[in-house]
Design a protein with these regions (language model features):
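A short acidic, Gly/Pro-enriched loop at the edge of an enzyme's catalytic core
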Residues: 93-103
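A short glycine-rich, Lys/Arg-flanked "PGG" loop and its adjoining helix->strand segment in the class I
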Residues: 121-133
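C-terminal lobe and adjacent flexible extensions of AdoMet/dcAdoMet transferase-like proteins
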Residues: 201-246
């Protein structure tokens, strides 16, 4: 059987590396790191690519993810890069044991995987409690334009020597929600290919909803940007960035 490491390699292979450069650059512009203020928690850190970049930029990084298998790969990646990073297996819906941080990030639209706005609000409350005073929380989500106009009917196919991937996206029932159907064909040790199917459900909300949920969590202010730039969103922006201050 193909291992989870295989799937992680597939994910990493099809992920656009330039996005990590953009996330890093955006973060460095908006996280006021100092000698005494550099503790950073990365939520949904996955295989640790972004965690390593934060560490290389001088942050004291902790990465949190639901998947123990993903974290094993993240630990290997950090070790290979000679970066000291703590990785925690955990859920962003419960950060009570995660410690305190100056900064928290949650990228790659991971907030959109929460099942409803109640869970989104719960994540915001958990992050608020995990932040030191004047701490900063940055997250990105799909815009409603992305979920309503861009994603429905989206289809992406990738073929490589040892794997193939089919990715199709459809509109879901709830407002601003989508379903990604992914099929992997992964080469086994004997040369044959095995098929694996995944379904990913995502949902975003109007900016006003995020505004209310952040305020209810206790954040005193936030700034809204779009598409990795320090500019306000337009009606055609695809990714919203929230920079929130405790």
């Amino acid at each position: 059987m193909a291992t989870y490491e295989t799937f992680a390699a597939v994910y990493d292979a099809v992920m656009d590396d330039s996005l990590y450069d953009l996330w890093t650059d955006f973060s460095l512009r908006h996280l006021p790191k100092t000698k005494d203020k550099k503790k950073l928690l990365e939520l949904a850190c996955g295989t640790g690519i972004q965690s390593v970049r934060f560490s290389q930029a001088g942050f004291d990084v902790t990465g949190l993810d639901l998947s123990a298998d993903m974290l094993k790969i993240a630990e290997k990646r950090a070790s290979s890069a000679k970066q000291k990073i703590d990785f925690i297996e955990g859920n962003m819906l419960d950060l009570s044991r995660a410690g305190k941080y100056d900064f928290v990030t949650c990228y790659s639209d991971s907030i959109c995987y929460m099942k409803d706005e109640v869970e989104v609000g719960d994540v915001f409350k958990e992050v608020y409690n995990a932040l030191n005073e004047d701490g900063v929380f940055i997250f990105d989500v799909h815009s409603t334009y992305q979920t309503d106009e861009v994603f429905p009917g989206y289809s992406y196919h990738e073929n490589a020597e040892d794997f193939a991937m089919l990715w199709d996206t459809y509109e879901d029932e709830a407002p601003h929600s989508i379903v990604h159907e992914l099929t992997f064909f992964v080469q086994e040790e004997d040369g044959s290919f095995s098929r694996h199917d995944e379904v990913h459900e995502e949902r975003t909300y109007e900016v006003l909803t995020y505004d209310i949920l952040l305020e209810q969590a206790g954040f005193k202010s936030f700034k809204l940007f779009a598409d990795f730039e320090d500019k306000e969103p337009t009606e055609n922006s695809r990714r919203w960035f929230f920079v929130c201050e405790k």
